[in-house]
């Protein structure tokens, strides 16, 4: 999941560099959502293993 977040972040950077603001914003939002979801799942997995 971190891999997909990084891929979308790179797409956002490339799109913003090339002037595609809408695509860059959408890709950045997807990257942010995937990163937040991955961190939440990591924390849940970490806590469940400790119990």
From Swiss-Prot:
Pfam family, one: DUF1328
Membrane-crossing residue ranges in chain numbering: 6-26, 28-47
This protein's GO CC annotations: plasma membrane
Cellular localization per UniProt: Cell membrane
Signal sequence residues: none
Protein origin, superkingdom: Bacteria
Alphabetical list of InterPro entries matching this protein: DUF1328 (IPR009760)
Keyword annotations: Cell membrane, Membrane, Transmembrane, Transmembrane helix
Membrane topology recorded in Swiss-Prot or TrEMBL: Multi-pass membrane protein
Recorded family membership: Belongs to the UPF0391 family.
Protein name: UPF0391 membrane protein Pcryo_0139
Organism listed in the record: Psychrobacter cryohalolentis (strain ATCC BAA-1226 / DSM 17306 / VKM B-2378 / K5)
Lineage, uppermost ranks: Bacteria, Pseudomonadati, Pseudomonadota, Gammaproteobacteria, Moraxellales
